[in-house]
Amino acid sequence: MNENLFASFITPMMFGLPLVTLIVLFPSLLFPTSNRLVNNRLISLQQWMLQLVSKQMMSIHNTKGQTWALMLMSLILFIGSTNLLGLLPHSFTPTTQLSMNLGMAIPLWGGAVITGFRNKTKASLAHFLPQGTPTPLIPMLVIIETISLFIQPVALAVRLTANITAGHLLIHLIGGATLALMSINTTTALITFIILILLTVLEFAVAMIQAYVFTLLVSLYLHDNT
């Protein structure tokens, strides 16, 4: 009970399994095509998942934006897999670190913005000044739009960090309460254990949803600049 609540987020704490092997094998999910005439269930599930996600992500993009399809698919698989691996006992979740999430958000956001300035320079600059703005408000609106542009990657990273960290802390707190109540009140301990199971199931869903939200927002930033 004296363990620090943030101990599971310390980088040196790793699950005692060769997770590097799993990480290296994750890109194979992007190439589910088999030489067999009839695919097995795993390959069929991979194809269905990739087609569904790519349809949701890339349907709004033009030809130039669709060149980012493989990168966005890699991104959602990477974030989703790291979030799910972080739910294993005594494992470390990289996406609870703001530095890592900023390291993903800033280059992707920057790439989308640079693409917009290269392909649609006038349209990108026009975003800083909405049409019909009164002359006295022009300097203020330009500053506000500039701040809102540069805060996008920060909001993207903070959203992912906060959601993953909050779920892990809740699981840690309720798990500790369950252990403490086992010797005091068995009925209450059983109730908290059921809540813990439900919260764990919810955290699995949150892990995938946050990967989808992160990638979808990057896709929307790209759509605004292509």
Curated annotation (Swiss-Prot):
Recorded topology in the membrane: Multi-pass membrane protein
The keyword Transport appears for this protein: yes
InterPro entries registered for this protein in UniProt: ATP_synth_F0_asu (IPR000568), ATP_synth_F0_asu_AS (IPR023011), ATP_synth_F0_asu_bact/mt (IPR045083), F0_ATP_A_sf (IPR035908)
GO cellular component, one term: mitochondrial inner membrane
Matches recorded under PROSITE patterns: ATPASE_A
Gene3D superfamilies from the UniProt entry: ATP synthase, F0 complex, subunit A
Compartmental location: Mitochondrion inner membrane
Keywords per UniProt: ATP synthesis, CF(0), Hydrogen ion transport, Ion transport, Membrane, Mitochondrion, Mitochondrion inner membrane, Transmembrane, Transmembrane helix, Transport
Chemical reaction(s) catalysed: H(+)(in) = H(+)(out)
Biological role stated in the UniProt entry: Subunit a, of the mitochondrial membrane ATP synthase complex (F(1)F(0) ATP synthase or Complex V) that produces ATP from ADP in the presence of a proton gradient across the membrane which is generated by electron transport complexes of the respiratory chain. ATP synthase complex consist of a soluble F(1) head domain - the catalytic core - and a membrane F(1) domain - the membrane proton channel. These two domains are linked by a central stalk rotating inside the F(1) region and a stationary peripheral stalk.
Similarity-based family: Belongs to the ATPase A chain family.
Subunit structure: Component of the ATP synthase complex composed at least of ATP5F1A/subunit alpha, ATP5F1B/subunit beta, ATP5MC1/subunit c (homooctomer), MT-ATP6/subunit a, MT-ATP8/subunit 8, ATP5ME/subunit e, ATP5MF/subunit f, ATP5MG/subunit g, ATP5MK/subunit k, ATP5MJ/subunit j, ATP5F1C/subunit gamma, ATP5F1D/subunit delta, ATP5F1E/subunit epsilon, ATP5PF/subunit F6, ATP5PB/subunit b, ATP5PD/subunit d, ATP5PO/subunit OSCP.
Protein name (record): ATP synthase F(0) complex subunit a
Source organism of this protein record: Ovis aries
Lineage: Eukaryota, Metazoa, Chordata, Craniata, Vertebrata
